[in-house]
Amino acid sequence: MKLLFIVNPISGDIDKEPFLEEAKELCSFYGINFLVFKTTGKQDTLKLNKILDDFKPDRVASVGGDGTTLFTAISLLHENIPMGIIPLGSANGMATELYVHPEPIQALKDILLSQMIYGLDLL
């Protein structure tokens, strides 16, 4: 499995590095090929599109809050790649509404292990 983490380093004013370190250990332990893309606010869409073309992930994990979730969903709109949410923003409203586990590492385990994939309507 190839997993792409899309990380907003400043969402919710929460340090993402402790989560990323634990996530890297988990992925390495299970032999999951992963890549971390950190948003900067400068040409993120262009950079992400290139990564999607080059890396060709099997799944994407959106790491941040609602804004990161929206950015990730829009970026994957015309792709056939399942997306999961790692709730590391300030309110995590979308993650809460979608019953995503509130603990980031457990949410990652759900993304990695779940075979239940659902479509969502985007307006």
PLM-predicted stretches and their roles:
Residues D58, S62, E97-L98:
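Short gly/ser-rich anion-binding loops that grip negatively charged ligand groups
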Residues K56, G64, N80:
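Conserved functional loop/turn residues at catalytic and ligand-binding sites
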